[in-house]
Amino acid sequence: MPKMKSNKGASKRFKKTAGGIKFKHATKRHILTKRTTKNKRQLRPNSLLPKCEVAAVARMLPYA
């Protein structure tokens, strides 16, 4: 049986840890002058994926 392929987009965006699947928030690259300081601060830390999306991402990353 051939090896399963990982989804390359998902492998660059998500990291599996003991606590769950970690991801970085979007909209933090450029044009940040429109955003409030509070909003930028809330987007700063990495977060864990919600339970409802874990199964879908896990299917995309069979070897993670």
UniProtKB/Swiss-Prot annotation:
It comes from the Bacteria. Keywords: Ribonucleoprotein, Ribosomal protein. Pfam families: Ribosomal_L35p (PF01632). The keyword Ribonucleoprotein applies. GO terms for molecular function: structural constituent of ribosome. GO terms for biological process: translation. GO terms for cellular component: cytosolic large ribosomal subunit. HAMAP family: Ribosomal_bL35. PANTHER family: 54S RIBOSOMAL PROTEIN BL35M, LARGE RIBOSOMAL SUBUNIT PROTEIN BL35M. Belongs to the bacterial ribosomal protein bL35 family. This is Large ribosomal subunit protein bL35. The gene is rpmI.
